[in-house]
From Swiss-Prot:
GO terms for molecular function: ATP binding; CCA tRNA nucleotidyltransferase activity; magnesium ion binding; tRNA binding. Mg(2+) binds at residues 36, 38. CDD domains: NT_ClassII-CCAase (cd05398). It comes from Coxiella burnetii (strain Dugway 5J108-111). GO terms for biological process: RNA repair; tRNA 3'-terminal CCA addition. Its EC number is 2.7.7.72. This is CCA-adding enzyme. Catalyzes the addition and repair of the essential 3'-terminal CCA sequence in tRNAs without using a nucleic acid template. Adds these three nucleotides in the order of C, C, and A to the tRNA nucleotide-73, using CTP and ATP as substrates and producing inorganic pyrophosphate. tRNA 3'-terminal CCA addition is required both for tRNA processing and repair. Also involved in tRNA surveillance by mediating tandem CCA addition to generate a CCACCA at the 3' terminus of unstable tRNAs. While stable tRNAs receive only 3'-terminal CCA, unstable tRNAs are marked with CCACCA and rapidly degraded.
Length: 376
């Protein structure tokens, strides 16, 4: 028994044919921690599941949440392609669908292994052998019917960087791209897979795989495999696990307006887009801090909003330092300057009842004096 953890005694699943499937079985076989568990139920109806206390959550096919563990239990199903895109499917879920039929619709053989309550592995498509040989291989030609599988495989390749892609699988991916299936991907799903890939062991491989099948030029025409941003991402991978920092690093060589377009196209969270644009726009200025006089330094702080958004600015200087890959006194220096500027006493200005432009000019003068004193 691998990861059933004693839930067999639960009244909710007693006498049901329940199997652990997918990534949980795969990761356990690889000796990796299991973060999520997915279950398949064979021979049951939706009515039987709800009668046992399961909460239906699936809109397109029967998926239920366990009343105690809140893990997902899906009825065994088959699927048939009826239109382009990842939503172009009809599903059949009924008591007569076998476990083997359910496993056959899955993307990769290493994700098509099931485990019985007794710990027996059911592996009709050779997933264990592919795990042993470190191969990412499709279960059936139905792989080419769902464009999301291109993204998922690319993302999985970042998690398992020493796994190769089976030549036949790569050929299917190329056919999908040529058939225009990639064009049907929705922005949210592209971003979801990219963000997860950025947090994995080798994020650059996400783009390598997309490039190999021809999808990179369609999904991310701004990103070049030979670009400085890709090289920077490769160099910082072992220094930070943060998808946020890695995203900004990847685009550090792009014009800010191009980053904005990419972020808008895939509905990238503002936190990611803002940092990436900040690094692209002001990264070179940060590297040259030592050459700036007090006026340039103050302008730099104001343009980067360093005085108001300290956390984002800290992320900015951290990213810039990683990209430059040199140890310097820049972070300490700029933080001292920020502290000095923030410490400026404005009470005398208030006592003089200065307002508007007069107040702004007087405040600027005090800030410049504070910086000048520090750097002279």
């Amino acid at each position: 028994m691998l990861v059933f953890y004693g839930f067999l005694s639960s009244r909710s699943i007693s006498h049901l044919k329940v199997y652990l499937v997918g990534g949980a079985v795969r990761d356990q076989l690889l000796g990796l921690p299991v973060k999520e568990k997915d279950w398949v139920v064979v021979g049951a109806t939706p009515e039987e599941m709800t009668a046992r206390g399961f909460k239906p959550v699936g809109k397109e096919f029967p998926v239920f949440l366990h009343p105690e563990t809140h893990e997902e239990y899906a009825l065994a199903r088959t699927e048939r392609k009826v239109a382009k895109g990842y939503k172009g499917f009809t599903f059949y879920a009924a008591p007569d669908v076998s476990l083997e039929e359910d496993l056959k619709r899955r993307d990769l053989t290493i994700n098509a292994i099931a485990e019985t309550p007794e710990g027996q592995l059911i592996d009709p498509y050779g997933g264990q052998e592919d795990l042993k040989n470190k191969v990412l291989r499709h279960v059936s030609v139905a792989f080419q019917e769902d464009p999301v599988r291109v993204l998922r495989l690319a993302r999985l390749a970042t998690k398992f960087p020493d796994f190769s892609i089976h030549p036949d699988t790569l050929e299917l991916m190329k056919k999908m791209v040529c058939a225009g299936e990639i064009d049907a991907l929705v922005p949210e799903r592209v971003w979801q897979e990219l963000n997860r890939a950025l947090g994995n062991e080798k994020p650059t491989r996400f783009f390598t795989v997309l490039n190999q099948c021809g999808a990179l030029a369609i999904l991310f025409p701004e990103i070049k495999m030979e670009g400085k941003g890709m090289a920077a991402l490769q160099s910082v991978t072992d220094k930070t696990p943060s998808p946020l920092i890695r995203f900004a690093t990847l685009q550090s060589d792009l014009p800010p307006e191009i980053i904005q377009k990419l972020a808008g196209r895939y509905r990238v969270p503002n936190e990611y887009a803002d940092l990436a644009i900040l690094v692209a726009r002001f990264g070179s200025d940060y590297v040259n801090l030592n050459r700036m006089d007090e006026t340039s330094l103050l302008n730099f702080l104001l343009k980067t909003d360093a005085l108001r958004r300290q956390e984002r600015f800290d992320q900015f200087i951290f990213t810039c330092d990683l990209i430059s890959s040199t140890t310097s006194s820049q972070p300490k220096k700029i933080k001292e300057i920020i502290k000095a500027v923030k410490s400026v006493d404005i009470k005398p200005l208030q006592e003089k009842q200065l307002k508007g432009e007069a107040f702004a000019k007087a405040l600027e003068k005090l800030r410049l004096e504070a910086i000048r004193t520090l750097i002279s």
